[in-house]
Design a protein with these regions (language model features):
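C-terminal "cap" of GNAT-fold acetyltransferases
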Residues: 3-10, 23, 118-161
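Acetyl-CoA-dependent GNAT
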Residues: 4-83, 89, 107, 113, ...
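Short coil/turn motifs at secondary-structure junctions
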Residues: 76-78, 96, 129-131
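Short coil/turn segments at alpha/beta junctions that flank glycine-rich nucleotide-binding fingerprints
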Residues: 84, 100, 117-120
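Structural detector for helix-capping/boundary residues
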Residues: 89-91, 140
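A short, internal acetyl-CoA/4′-phosphopantetheine-binding micro-motif in the GNAT/acyltransferase core
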Residues: 91-98
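Conserved acyl-CoA
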Residues: 94, 105-121
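Conserved acetyl-CoA-binding loop-helix of GNAT-fold acetyltransferases
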Residues: 99-112, 135-139
């Protein structure tokens, strides 16, 4: 595999911002996510919205010069542990680059940063029918519980640190 690099996005860097919009739009185009992509107003408001949130962490994955993966995370607190927690809000890898360990590497970096901040856990949500993502999360040590939502069953998963 080409050299994989995981790094924190700089929300003032135009290349990073374009990659964030591109990867999240590609993710939204997936049939499991509705298949329609992000609306123009969402695409234009995405970066300003991320910049306004002090609790956001955006990690990008690059292979050589191409940015091919993203993890959008939100810092929070576990009230039951009285410690920080980190939620993976979005995790996506460009379709042509899947199956190459990029998602695993992004999750490992999320976990490393969570441990560094003393987090009690990393959490995420995944659609029950998204078997590829569920398999990845299970391999990475996440365990889940299901709940019904209008769009189907969503699993809330956590990895305790």
């Amino acid at each position: 595999m080409s050299e994989l690099n995981i790094f924190q996005a700089e929300l003032e860097n135009n290349e990073h911002c374009e990659a964030i919009r591109r990867l999240l739009n590609e993710y939204a185009l997936e049939p499991l996510e509705g298949g329609t992509g992000l609306a123009p107003e969402v695409l234009s408001g995405l970066i300003p919205g991320l910049r306004e949130q002090s609790s956001v962490l955006v990690l990008l994955a690059s292979l050589e010069a191409d940015i091919v993966g993203i993890a959008v995370c939100l810092w929070g607190v576990s009230t039951f542990a009285a410690r920080p927690a980190l939620n993976i809000h979005d995790l996506a890898v460009s379709g042509a680059c899947r199956g190459r360990g990029i998602g695993t590497a992004l999750i490992a970096e999320v976990e490393r940063r969570a441990r560094e901040k003393g987090c009690s856990r990393v959490t995420l949500e995944v659609r029950a029918e998204n078997s590829n993502a569920r398999s990845l999360y299970t391999r990475c040590g996440f365990e889940g519980a299901a709940h019904e939502v209008p769009a189907g069953v969503t699993l809330f998963c956590a990895k305790y640190l």
